[in-house]
């Protein structure tokens, strides 16, 4: 059974994704592409870290369960987790919510979750974009959700310095998380 639970069998081709990252690197001539987040060094030496992500197929669970109040928390976590693993402290977050028809009940539950995720992450919900696209999305329950987070590095983490026998902490899951 476990051999069936992998990216390839779910229709995702990791090799093609990696090839696309190489295409992006070629086009942009950037060696900073390919990690979970990007680091930008300002002229004064301050380092900002940015990440964008989505909640992936967890949107399907929202629709099946008719539960939309926690997906925003997941969205913030997906983005913020990608910057904190670089040693960044989250500063702010922006969201992108696209749907066929704006349903105020669903939308307010989603934004409540995003706001809660920002509170839990100690970052500001700075803004976002709401896009009604009835030609692209079938109805109010057919939508996509993405986010963008920015943080600042105060204490750098050097992954190459991590070695065997270093202490690793595991945290208990709060439930089913997103796959991005």
Residue ranges and their predicted role:
Residues 1-180:
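Helix-biased detector of long, well-ordered alpha-helical tracts
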């Amino acid at each position: 059974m476990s051999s069936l639970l992998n990216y390839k069998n779910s229709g995702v081709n990791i090799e093609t994704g990696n090839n696309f990252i190489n295409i992006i690197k070629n086009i942009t001539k950037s060696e900073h592409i390919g990690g979970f987040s990007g680091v930008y060094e300002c002229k004064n030496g301050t380092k900002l870290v940015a990440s964008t992500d989505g909640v992936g197929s967890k949107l399907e669970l929202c629709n099946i369960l008719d539960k939309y109040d926690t997906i925003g928390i997941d969205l913030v976590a997906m983005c913020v987790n990608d910057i904190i693993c670089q040693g960044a402290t989250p500063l702010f977050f922006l969201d992108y919510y696209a749907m066929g028809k704006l349903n105020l009940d669903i939308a307010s539950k989603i934004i409540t979750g995003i706001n809660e995720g920002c509170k839990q992450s100690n970052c500001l919900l700075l803004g976002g974009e709401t896009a009604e696209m009835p030609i692209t999305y079938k109805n109010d329950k057919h939508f996509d959700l993405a986010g963008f987070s920015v943080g600042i590095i105060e204490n750098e983490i050097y992954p190459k310095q991590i070695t065997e026998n270093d202490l690793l902490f595991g945290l208990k899951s709060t439930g089913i998380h997103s796959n991005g």
